């Protein structure tokens, strides 16, 4: 090596001569920095940072920095995957756009490594305080040969001219005009002179694979990230456009759905009631004894189907739901007065008045319809039998609002039918003296099955006149005779003892008795507040909450000048041209996201929410004596006896009903049982029945639910693959809990 100079001054004064030792040019300050050879001096002007660079995806976390994943919301996208995608795409773009620099390497291995690393993102960092440097050194013996010395490593190159295409866009390198404007030091290819200050500049290559690749990695330009974020903005714009297209398509679909609501609607008299009469050759069925649980089967769903089939017979269940349910009136004329057996009677109503504290308004209504006006004549406090008798003598009708609360037979019928409809089923009874009427024309918010148990009644029923009147969610006010003039009923005729008439929700109806015979009918009602509208009332607020937490655009402020964009009143709004772009289209996109969220993630949980609501409102099951004996309720229990309920391997267990309980998830690691075993027979008369259930017992519950109505021994349950993931102790504790809350039958 040459002799090291002691000062910068002496180094500057030394003649520019060529040396055989390549290191001497560095010591003499004759070597040209690689940074100066290939890159201009960094600009001293403040660098503009695109706002997109500063945006970060915010995670939902609590004060302990624990990431939370919403149970119903989409999982937040991780930055890593998106970043890698943009790096790959943008790098490929750079390869196609950057100038072609033809440099022939003598080291073939280094060439292969460089080709390999061209697809990777390498950061350019300039740190003036670092000690590592990279230099080009001219070979003394060969003017066409240049050696790159980087951190102690040497790579030989042959000098070639840089060939640039005029048609290709410059990416990362400055144009010739920019180099002239920057007053760069001209590069002398013969002497490779360099300013000593440039010696301190260096390039730090960030290795992607290992340290050996560091020497050959390609230097990326400073504009790489700007280009990347421009691509991200373009993709974001494309995504916004796609959302707009989807929103437009869904808006069209929504409009088509709205138009289809009126298609096929048959108004008023054009609808026809269907009357089914019993064939004269069909033998009468024996009278039903409701005290003997006539429809009960091992499977509660089968029990429900039997009871409902009995109520509408001879129409079968499937035909009813296909042809009549919530669409047309069905009249069944059986010519069998004893068909409903001992379901209810006037004598039974007298017993209930005598033995129970029935109050006006709460349990009993007294009504009269005379000269086109309905009058309510309720008293105060308890309705005593003798007072009710006087009202009947005065041509008033008596309505028992909730007979299922006090009468076991009506309770049984309503309770078992609940599993057919999946919602609360209640009842009313109407006792009307001969030659009178108890109510004005009106419609109800429920589907009504009128069972004529005594006397006869003359009915008139009118169908809805418009789609707006179809299937209302609230009862109507009373209509007058003038209101009904000109409207032709879809059904008008007598309903005799043993007959049934089904009146869909929203059909106006009115009835009067025969001048010589009183009338008593039981109305079994279902479907109250049980519609898709009620479902959406529960799901949409939850979906809005989830979407608000996960979509920051929904949390943005409303556009400025909104009040000048539009309104209901036709005014000259100064910014009306911006209404669609800045308001309507944005709202449409949010509605599209809301619709997708509900459809993709919240429908299943909404079923659980409805089941939970059903468990709170539904009637409790009316158990047979055998079911009581095998359940926690007991029957004729000897409190001092030794016959305790024991759980052994041979003990058989079974759920008490298919839909008496529901296992619900509160979170990923917590669940509970909602049930109706202890519900009041008065609508929502007791608090909701909820019991915490161990998460370890889900598999055991699943086995019991899937095997219903079959009995399974504990040995069979514990031997199944589903339950072997938990210990027998955990499974047994979960099963015992089901017995303790009353939803499990146990047979030793």
UniProtKB/Swiss-Prot annotation:
Residues 399-543 form the JmjC domain. One of its GO terms (biological process) is response to osmotic stress. Fe cation binds at residues 442, 444, 509. This is Bifunctional lysine-specific demethylase and histidyl-hydroxylase NO66. PROSITE patterns: JMJC (PS51184). Disruption phenotype: Attenuated response to heat shock stress and reduced survival after heat shock and oxidative stress. Residues 65-135, 160-264 are annotated as: Disordered. It comes from Caenorhabditis elegans. Belongs to the ROX family. NO66 subfamily. It is found in: Nucleus. The lineage of its organism: Eukaryota, Metazoa, Ecdysozoa, Nematoda, Chromadorea. It is an enzyme of class 1 (oxidoreductase).
């Amino acid at each position: 090596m040459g002799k090291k100079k002691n000062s910068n001054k002496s180094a500057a004064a030394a003649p520019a001569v060529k040396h055989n030792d390549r290191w001497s040019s560095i010591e003499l300050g004759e070597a040209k920095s690689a940074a100066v050879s290939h890159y201009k001096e960094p600009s001293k002007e403040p660098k503009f940072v695109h706002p997109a660079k500063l945006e970060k995806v915010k995670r939902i976390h609590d004060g302990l920095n624990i990431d939370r994943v919403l149970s119903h919301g989409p999982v937040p996208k991780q930055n890593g995957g998106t970043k890698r995608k943009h790096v790959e795409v943008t790098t490929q773009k750079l390869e196609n756009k950057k100038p072609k620099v033809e440099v022939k390497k003598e080291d073939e291995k280094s060439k292969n490594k460089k080709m390999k690393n061209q697809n990777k993102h390498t950061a350019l960092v300039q740190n003036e305080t670092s000690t590592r440097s990279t230099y080009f050194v001219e070979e003394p013996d060969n003017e066409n040969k240049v050696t790159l010395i980087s951190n102690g490593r040497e790579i030989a190159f042959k000098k070639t001219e840089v060939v640039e295409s005029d048609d290709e866009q410059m990416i990362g390198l400055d144009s010739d005009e920019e180099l002239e404007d920057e007053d760069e030091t001209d590069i002398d290819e013969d002497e490779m002179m360099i300013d000593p200050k440039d010696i301190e500049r260096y390039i730090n290559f960030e290795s992607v694979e290992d340290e050996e690749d560091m020497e050959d990695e390609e230097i990326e330009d400073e504009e790489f990230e700007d280009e990347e974020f421009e691509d991200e903005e373009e993709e974001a714009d494309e995504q916004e456009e796609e959302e707009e297209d989807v929103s437009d398509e869904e808006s069209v679909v929504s409009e088509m759905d709205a138009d289809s609501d009126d298609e096929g609607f048959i108004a008023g008299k054009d609808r026809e009631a269907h009357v089914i009469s019993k064939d004269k050759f069909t033998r009468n069925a024996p009278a039903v004894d409701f005290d003997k649980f006539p429809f009960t089967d091992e499977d509660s769903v089968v029990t429900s189907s039997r009871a409902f089939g009995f109520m509408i017979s001879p129409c079968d269940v499937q035909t009813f739901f296909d042809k009549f349910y919530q669409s047309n009136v069905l009249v069944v004329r059986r010519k069998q007065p004893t068909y409903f057996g001992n379901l209810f009677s006037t004598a039974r109503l007298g017993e209930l008045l005598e033995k129970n504290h029935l109050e006006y308004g709460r349990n009993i209504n007294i009504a009269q319809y005379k000269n086109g006006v309905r009058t309510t004549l309720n008293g105060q406090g308890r309705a005593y039998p003798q007072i009710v008798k006087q009202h009947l003598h005065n041509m008033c009708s008596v309505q028992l609002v909730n007979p299922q609360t006090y009468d076991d037979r009506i309770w049984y019928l309503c309770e078992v039918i609940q599993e057919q409809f999946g919602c609360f089923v209640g009842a009313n009874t109407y006792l009307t003296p001969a030659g009178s009427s108890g109510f004005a024309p009106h419609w109800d918010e429920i589907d009504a099955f009128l069972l004529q148990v005594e006397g006869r009644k003359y009915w008139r029923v009118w169908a809805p006149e418009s789609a707006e009147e179809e299937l209302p969610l609230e009862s109507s006010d009373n209509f007058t005779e003038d209101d009904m003039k000109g409207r032709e009923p879809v059904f008008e005729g007598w309903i005799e003892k043993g007959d049934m008439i089904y009146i869909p929700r929203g059909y106006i109806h009115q009835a009067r008795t025969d001048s010589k015979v009183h009338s008593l009918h039981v109305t079994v009602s279902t479907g109250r507040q049980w519609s898709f509208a009620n479902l959406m009332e529960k799901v949409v607020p939850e979906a809005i909450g989830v979407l608000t937490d996960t979509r920051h655009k929904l949390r943005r402020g409303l556009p400025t000048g909104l009040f000048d964009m539009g309104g209901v009143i036709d005014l000259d709004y100064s910014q009306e041209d911006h209404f669609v772009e800045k308001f309507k289209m944005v709202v449409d996109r949010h509605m599209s996201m809301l619709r997708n969220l509900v459809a993709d993630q919240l429908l299943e949980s909404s079923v659980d929410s409805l089941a939970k609501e059903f468990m709170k409102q539904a009637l409790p099951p009316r158990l047979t004596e055998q079911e009581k004996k095998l359940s926690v309720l007991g029957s004729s229990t000897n409190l001092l006896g030794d016959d305790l309920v024991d759980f052994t391997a041979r003990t058989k267990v079974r759920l008490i009903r298919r839909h008496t309980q529901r296992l619900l998830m509160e979170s990923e690691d917590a669940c509970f049982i909602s049930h109706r075993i202890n519900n009041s027979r008065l609508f929502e008369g007791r608090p909701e029945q909820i019991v915490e259930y161990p998460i370890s017992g889900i598999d055991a519950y699943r086995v019991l639910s899937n095997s219903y109505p079959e009995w399974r021994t504990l040995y069979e349950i514990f031997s199944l693959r589903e339950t072997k993931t938990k210990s027998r102790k955990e499974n047994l504790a979960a099963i015992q809990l089901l017995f303790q809350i009353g939803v499990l039958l146990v047979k030793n």
